[in-house]
């Protein structure tokens, strides 16, 4: 059953490659002609472990096609996914221009029934706007062609997206017709055959599910960061607290790690949009407002520790920042805690050297010549007054601490992810962590 996916960004390309690997013929559509040409030339525009090989396999099997035209691919498919971006407006609400532009293009070009599935993260009620937009485009053409809309939100974690797609905790599908349900059941048959859960529900519930899931995870992170800050004040250890509460089966241990705040393309944007949606319906989410405020403050914790250590005497100090992406196994620096830290350091007059195993090209794009780009952790640490550990890449876990101790000016290690134990201390470093 051929399908089309419009919007070949992170979600769209991963979904397309995975569907193709399951035997589905996929037409990938994006208005960015340069991106489509790069894909045709075999270049992958995003970093995700295993994605290059998966895309190549799909192309070689003849199951992945690339186009810039919705009208060109519509005659070949019965299901068309919209996976375009929904960036936040100034007020935090999701910008639906791209989603509705896709809907309009479908309404202008469709000649036969199709199921229009929104995979983008969108506010509740978006499916009604998509339906109205397609109907309006048809009216302008003087036609009335049947179609259905559905919601199929993604739950992919950057760095583990292929595994998440192929072996999901669940697949959420929102439909409002038997035909739409039957088509989505056929599409996800390989998932069902492997005994993974496909949960059908109404469309509004599916749209809320995505926001609620990310908001819940963000809440756990901010809660543990609040606990960590209290632990520091009273002399407790947040790692011990995490073990104590995480062993409770009702709570579990996932997303209970304190640190220097969350970032990325999902949590900050989705929490803001969920807050905005709730306000529009007269149901303010005060818990999420606090979650957001806590996270904003937490991104300043590492700089505050550094400033206290030196009594505010920071001008001219050299520092190293390890980890620039918002999490390991990605080059995504959107809303990354590293950016807040680096900006604070530069404003204080510090000289900053940075290193990340993957995100250096993205860092150059964002930071320009304001920082020094190190070759590795050892190069970054030459004659510095502090090393900041911001992203928990495995490559940072076991460096030669004795070598680093001889390289630095001041043996200060500020660990924003609480991953180091006694090794740096035994080598002579002062270790500052969060909540312990």
Question: Can you annotate each of these PLM segments?
Answer:
Residues 1-436:
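Structural/interface elements that position substrates and couple domains in central-metabolism enzymes
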């Amino acid at each position: 059953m051929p399908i089309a996916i419009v919007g070949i960004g992170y979600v769209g390309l991963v979904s397309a490659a995975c569907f193709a690997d399951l035997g589905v013929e996929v037409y990938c559509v994006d208005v960015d002609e340069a991106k489509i040409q790069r894909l045709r030339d075999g270049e992958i525009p995003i970093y995700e472990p295993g994605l290059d090989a998966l895309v190549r396999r799909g192309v070689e099997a003849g199951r992945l096609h690339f186009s810039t035209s919705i009208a060109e691919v519509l005659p070949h498919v019965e299901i068309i996914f919209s996976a375009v971006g929904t960036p936040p407006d100034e007020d935090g609400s999701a910008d639906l221009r791209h989603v509705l532009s896709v809907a309009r293009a479908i309404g202008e070009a469709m000649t036969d029934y199709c199921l229009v599935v929104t995979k983008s993260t969108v506010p509740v009620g978006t499916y009604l706007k998509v339906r109205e937009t397609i109907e309006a485009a048809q009216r302008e053409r003087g036609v009335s062609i049947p179609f259905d809309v559905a919601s199929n939100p993604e739950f992919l974690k950057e760095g583990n997206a292929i595994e998440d797609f192929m072996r999901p905790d669940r697949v959420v599908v929102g439909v409002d017709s038997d035909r739409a349900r039957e088509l989505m059941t056929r599409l996800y048959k390989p998932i069902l055959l492997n005994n993974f859960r496909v949960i059908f529900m109404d469309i509004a519930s599916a749209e809320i599910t995505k926001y609620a899931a990310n908001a819940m995870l963000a809440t756990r992170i901010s809660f543990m960061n609040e606990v960590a800050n209290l632990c520091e004040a009273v002399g407790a250890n947040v790692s011990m607290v995490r073990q104590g509460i995480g062993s409770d089966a009702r709570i579990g241990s996932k997303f209970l790690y304190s640190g220097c705040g969350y970032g990325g393309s999902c949590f900050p944007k989705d929490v803001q949009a969920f807050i905005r949606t709730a306000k529009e319906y007269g149901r303010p989410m005060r818990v999420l407002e606090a979650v957001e405020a806590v996270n904003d403050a937490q991104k300043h914790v590492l700089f505050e520790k550094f400033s206290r250590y030196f009594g505010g005497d920071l001008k001219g100090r050299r520092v190293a920042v390890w980890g620039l992406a918002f999490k390991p196994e990605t080059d995504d620096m959107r809303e990354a805690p590293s950016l807040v830290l680096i900006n604070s350091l530069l404003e204080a007059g510090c000289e900053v050297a940075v290193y990340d195993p993957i995100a250096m090209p993205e860092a150059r794009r964002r930071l320009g010549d304001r920082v020094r780009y190190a070759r590795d952790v050892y190069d970054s640490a030459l004659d510095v007054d502090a090393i900041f550990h911001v992203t928990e890449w495995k490559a940072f876990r076991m460096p030669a601490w004795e070598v680093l101790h001889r390289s630095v000016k001041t043996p200060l290690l500020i660990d924003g992810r609480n991953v180091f134990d006694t090794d740096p201390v035994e080598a002579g470093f002062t270790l500052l962590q969060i909540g312990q």
